[in-house]
Design a protein with these regions (language model features):
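ATP-binding/phosphotransfer module of carbohydrate and carboxylate kinases, centering on a glycine-rich
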Residues: 1-67, 110-116, 160-256
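Glycine-rich beta-strand-to-loop/alpha-helix junction loops that act as flexible
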Residues: 73-80, 122-124, 244-254
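Phosphate-binding/catalytic loop of phosphoryl-transfer enzymes
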Residues: 76-173
Length: 256
């Protein structure tokens, strides 16, 4: 059956967005929800996506049964992992058609209108995608422990490590390192206990403080941003070579 509606979902590690249109592309409704990383927390991510689907259909003034007349494309963080793809094969929302790809693939397609090019998403985590006109090549996206070069989570981790070094007088202190340690009552043990449950988003929460400190002339903060810029440059050079087209930077850290 020919679908009557088109639904796109951009599911990132911090939040997800949905947009419902008719077949002519006229927007009927748009909604946002919580994180939708199917690698980090598969069940919670799909619960969030399911709630978002219901919300955007309702906001369009349609009955939920309209989903059976809707073609759905979901770009979800973590959907590039093979084991996750196997689980997603059993996800069957009540829609007319379904395609699930990674969030970075839909970002690349949207940024360049289907033409050759690449994107590097630098938010809480990071991942790149290059489209050469025939196929996508993905770079990174292997999680906070192994990957996420240039990301907010990695920047936050470096900053807190630096703060701990300064606290123990291994390197000089600065306004930034003192400010960061103050959040843990200047206690390395408190910091250690926090790391047990800290998510990538938790690590990334100190990023605004780093930028503010760098603007104020804090040398440690400026060094941290230089390291992050070098990481981003490394990824961008490879993406440029893969796509032979322009590279778009996206995500929270790419915002001026």
């Amino acid at each position: 059956m020919q679908p009557h509606y088109l639904l796109g979902i951009d599911g990132g590690g911090t939040q997800c967005r949905a947009r419902l249109t008719d077949l002519q592309g006229r927007m009927l409704a748009e909604a946002t929800g919580g994180p939708a990383n199917v690698w980090s927390d598969y069940d919670a991510a799909l619960t969030c996506v399911g709630q978002l689907i219901d919300r955007v259909v309702s906001q369009a003034g349609l009955a939920l049964e309209a989903l059976t007349q809707t073609a759905l494309v979901a770009g979800l963080a973590g959907a590039n992992v093979t084991s996750v793809q196997a689980r997603l094969a059993s996800w069957q929302p009540a829609c007319a058609a379904l395609q699930v790809v990674s969030d970075v693939e839909i970002a690349c397609a949207g940024a360049h209108g289907g033409a050759p090019g690449a994107v590097f998403i630098i938010g809480t985590g990071s991942q790149g995608a290059a489209w050469d006109g025939d196929q996508f090549t993905l770079l990174g996206g292997w999680g906070f422990a192994l990957s996420d070069q240039g990301s907010g989570a990695e920047l936050g981790r470096r900053a807190l490590r630096l703060a701990l070094l300064a606290h123990e007088a291994i390197i000089t202190q600065s306004a930034l390192t003192r400010q960061l340690m103050a959040q843990f009552d200047h206690s390395p043990e408190t910091m250690l206990l926090w790391t047990r449950s800290a998510t990538p988003a938790d690590w990334a929460r100190v990023v605004p403080q780093i930028f503010a400190a760098a603007d104020a002339g804090d040398g440690h903060a400026q060094d941290l941003l230089h390291q992050t810029a070098a990481d981003i440059g490394l990824m961008v050079r490879r993406l440029t070579a893969l796509s032979s087209g322009p590279v778009a930077l996206m995500g929270g850290l790419a915002t001026p």
